Amino acid sequence: MKNKSFAVIGLGQFGMTLAVTLAESDCDVLAIDDKEENIEEISEKVTYAVKADVREPGILKALGVQNVDVAIIAVAENLEASISATMQAKDLGVPFVVAKSMNSLHGRILDKIGADKIIYPEQAMGLRVARNLLSGGYLDVFELSAEFSMAEFSIPESWVGKSLIDLNVRERFHINIIGIKQGENVTVDLKPSEPLPDQIGRAHV
């Protein structure tokens, strides 16, 4: 069976990790970035690594991106490059185009120009952290927008007796605790310096 082939465009932390992981899973990976140091770092880890500016018209065709099964556009921080690469991949007939987005407006633009799947890695990371933080488990999530979600989870024993300042969840996990539920009562006026009592059941973030 033919190995599945991917083009990963943009080798920031997200793109670099994705490209290497796919290559380690025996996929054929074409990695593209405009920084020589990124190409040098990944060149021996993927099938092909090429330095190119994806804002240049026709560059993806010249690099053979039309031959891959999936193109992943991971250059969200540069809006022009993100749009250009997504449009080129779609025009080339790549079967499935995944585009990384930084916010809901960016996501709507990518949707309009035909991206098959739009991902928000920072949001996804926050949700994964919330799911895996606690032995009691992740209970529910409400998507408020492409950028924000609200989740409910059980408080782990390791948090009992510590204050929100001690836990520093905003810096460590990129979440904000907005309320604490005890029985049927929900407290939203939280005092960051007060330790969490042992009878707390759930937190909302």
Protein language model regions, located:
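N-terminal Rossmann-fold NAD(P) dinucleotide-binding loop
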Residues: G15-M16
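A charged, well-structured terminal subsegment
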Residues: L127-S145, S158
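Conserved acidic E/D residue at the C-terminus of a beta-strand in Rossmann-like folds
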Residues: I32-D34, S101
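Phosphate-bearing ligand-interacting subdomains
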Residues: E40, K45-V129, S154
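Hydrophobic Val/Ile/Leu positions in short beta-strands of Rossmann-like dinucleotide-binding domains
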Residues: A7-V8, I73
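Aromatic pocket-lining residues of Rossmann-like dinucleotide-binding sites
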Residues: L22
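Short beta-strand element of Class I
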Residues: D28-L30, V97
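Cytosolic Rossmann-like ligand/nucleotide-binding regulatory domains
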Residues: K2, I9, I32, E157-H204
